[in-house]
């Protein structure tokens, strides 16, 4: 997968990825702004803006925006992360001009009508409530807070009810004006379409975008710690993690392979030892989360109140074992899993759009899949053990727990096990 990059005079970048054998196309607009770019008083504003972009423009009301894409069988959506916000449409190939027009409209001509703002404020408050009532959801917010306390990257993407209630139309309009600039945005299309016609339409639709304003972002500084909440539940939802690495760290792929060996599937060490052998959990897995200037590694599990006392020592033991010994069979299996996942994703126009958009946001260029596969194949057992040892030696443990916590050890005792 290699997308062609075109840069317009105003700095807007366009990535075209033509797939002539398919009948669909996915077009996305990536903006280089997420919850980590917010001040404390703005926490949740990126997410609210993403919602409000669909609630009316100068020429379409909220219903029009929903119907115009669905009338042709298309799908329109968006999502906010800590570093980016993405708006996209998935359509039949002949409907690409319509989808692009709608995206350009909502990203440049939203009116933030007061009645719609009040209505959507209620929707987001319900979303926050749903997240708070879902232990295996809210525990991830607690983990971020433990890892990055009192920082934008450690705050919840949704914000708080009080802050959501405080946002005004002027707040939304000002935030969009500050951050939705040509040099901070990338338009990506993957699927069956005419490349020249698409680039020409993007140039026409986004001609009014101005160049970027210098927006400063606080660096992500990992600390570690414990965030917990006692709840009357059947299970303890638990996240245990360490400081991770950036996307461009030389150990990035070794870290991914390490995570796969430790907790990346039914054949992983944690699944086999914790679930299959001991029956302590239904689900357990590990994952890496990287940012442009940091990252984290974590293990998520759900277990009973009494079982948590056995679970944590077993997890610690498995991590120490992995730092001392990894078989070539395990590494080969993890590499195969990563490569298969990558190659399978290339059959989806939406997955390709997301990969290209993310690569442009992070690296400023599309990364050919052959280059990624080459880096995966370079990882050996020594690199995996070395990275695990590197991570454990820092020993900045982050712990988040929600549920019946009577048997949970205090932070220092947990940290000492690792």
What residue spans do the PLM features occupy?
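Short, Gly/Pro- and small/polar-rich lid/capping loops
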Residues: 1-10
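Charge-rich, well-structured scaffold segments of protease-associated domains
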Residues: 7, 18, 62-217, 228, ...
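Active/ligand-binding-proximal structured segments within catalytic/core domains
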Residues: 11, 18-69, 143, 180, ...
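Short hydrophobic-aromatic micro-motifs
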Residues: 13-16, 229, 238-240
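Active-site-flanking beta-strand signature of metal-NTP-handling nucleotidyl enzymes
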Residues: 26-29, 238-241, 400
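Acidic, glycine-rich loop-and-beta core segments that form the ion-binding/anion-interacting portion
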Residues: 201, 233-241, 249
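C-terminal non-catalytic interaction appendages of large macromolecular assemblies
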Residues: 219, 235-238, 256
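Flexible, small-/acidic-enriched active-site or ligand-binding loops
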Residues: 224-225
